[in-house]
Structures are given as structure tokens and as C-alpha cells.
Amino acid sequence: MNLSGSVEMHEKAPNSMLAVLVINGAAYRQGFNGTAGWADDPQNGLREMAGAELEETRRDSDFYHPLDLKKIYTKFNVTGLEKVRERDAHVVEASLAEGGVDKLYFDVPSGLVLRIVSQHHTPDGVITFSEDLSDYRDVDGVKLPFTVHQSSAESDFTIRFSEIHHNVTQEDGQFSKPAAQ
């Protein structure tokens, strides 16, 4: 099945995030305001996050997490070299403070992250996600991936960002759980 849609991501330091994905008119929204996380989708409706799902969202919403991996992970173990889309990548198993291990694949020549394999808690249980990052471009002196391919047992999709802007004013209220409709 080949579906298309749009995605909008809003982030604000230190740890607020809003993601809106619209596919075939159906909206999937997820937010975190620094304290509380929420999701709104056609299958589960509007709900607050709790437990492991909330902690993962808190970690993923850390604006600076790509720059401070030692804050997220307690131990790193280089396990070898693998190919990711025809590129050599160092494979690093990174242990999370709350338990579990993510696999990070770093491009040998550039050091940029090419793939992240991690487990996420959802209303449907624990799901393993693989996220491939590519088409890195310079945005205000920072290399950012403009293409993100996410796959799991339940889904497989590619997000292509048309533009990324830094230092855009973000209203704090947009990150909070909306009122039920």
C-alpha cells in the first residue's frame, strides 16, 4: 500500500515536542510539554501517556539529546562494522538508564547517525522500530537528515522534510494536551 501525507514537527528547548502526521485525511498527533505526554489518533482517540511510553517520549523530546548521548545512555559497546545502504557503519549498542538497548549505526567517514534500532512502548505493546536517516543537509551550520525511513512489524514509511527552520517562535500551549472534542 502506497499512501502519502504530510508531517509537521515542532520542537522547543529544553524538551517540548509536537508531531502532526496526516495520511488520507486522518490525523495522528503526539505532544510533550516538558512534563506530560499525549497522543491523538483515529484508533485510540485522545489519551495521556503514562509509564514506559511517557518516559520514552520524555527522552525523545529532549531537544539536545543528539548532542548529549551520555545523558541518555549509561554504557556504549562497539560491536562491529555493518553496511547501511551501501555505507560502512560502526554499530554501537547503547544501554538505556531505564533498561533496554538501542543500536546506533554511525557512518564511518562522517560520524553521522545512519540508523537507530530501538524498542518503543505503545498501546499495542512493545514494538521494535528501525529508523534510517539520510539526505543530511546543512541547516544553519548543523547537519540534519531530510529523509527518515521508519519501519516496524506494523508499518513502513518514509518522511521527507521539505524545509527545516531554526529559532522559530513556538507557543508553549501547542505542546499541551488539547481539550477533548
Q: At which residue positions do the language-model features occur?
A:
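Acidic/charged, solvent-exposed loop-and-adjacent secondary-structure segments enriched in E/D, K/R, S/T
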Residues: 38-64
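Gly/Pro-enriched, hydrophobic low-complexity segments
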Residues: 88-179
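Short, solvent-exposed loop/turn motifs
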Residues: 2, 27, 37, 45-47, ...
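Short, low-complexity Ser/Thr-rich regulatory SLiMs
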Residues: 11, 80-83, 135-138
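Short, solvent-exposed secondary-structure boundary motifs
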Residues: 1-3, 17-23, 64-74, 93-97, ...
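Short, conserved active-site entrance elements at the starts or edges of catalytic domains
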Residues: 56-91, 112-117
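Short amphipathic beta-strand/extended segments with alternating polar/hydrophobic composition
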Residues: 4-10, 30-34, 47-54, 106, ...
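N-terminal mature ectodomain segment of secretory-pathway/periplasmic proteins
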Residues: 1-45, 73, 77-78
